[in-house]
Amino acid sequence: MPRSLKKGPFIDLHLLKKVEKAVESGDKKPIKTWSRRSTIFPNMIGLTIAVHNGRQHVPVFVSDEMVGHKLGEFAPTRTYRGHAADKKAKKR
């Protein structure tokens, strides 16, 4: 269920401060964050945000199609290596 419209979008204040500082200075260095729950705002477009996936920081370049989505959607947390192959089928 989506967030109520009367509440508005959520963003962590520490991340918002870092984004505003990067936009103001024109800095293109990735912004490191653990805040996967924060919504992507229009002032983040063009920035690279390194989102933590539980093991490492995944660089996410923010484009205009991403506005309104959460940062965590673009940093996968699980690695799928496929199911084990059937050994009997391999012999044939």
From Swiss-Prot:
Gene Ontology, cellular component aspect: cytoplasm; small ribosomal subunit
MF terms (GO), sorted A to Z: rRNA binding; structural constituent of ribosome
A Pfam cross-reference name: Ribosomal_S19
Primary role: Protein S19 forms a complex with S13 that binds strongly to the 16S ribosomal RNA.
Similarity comment text for this entry: Belongs to the universal ribosomal protein uS19 family.
NCBIfam families named in the record: rpsS_bact
Protein's name according to its UniProt entry: Small ribosomal subunit protein uS19
Organism: Photorhabdus laumondii subsp. laumondii (strain DSM 15139 / CIP 105565 / TT01) (Photorhabdus luminescens subsp. laumondii)
Designated gene of the protein: rpsS
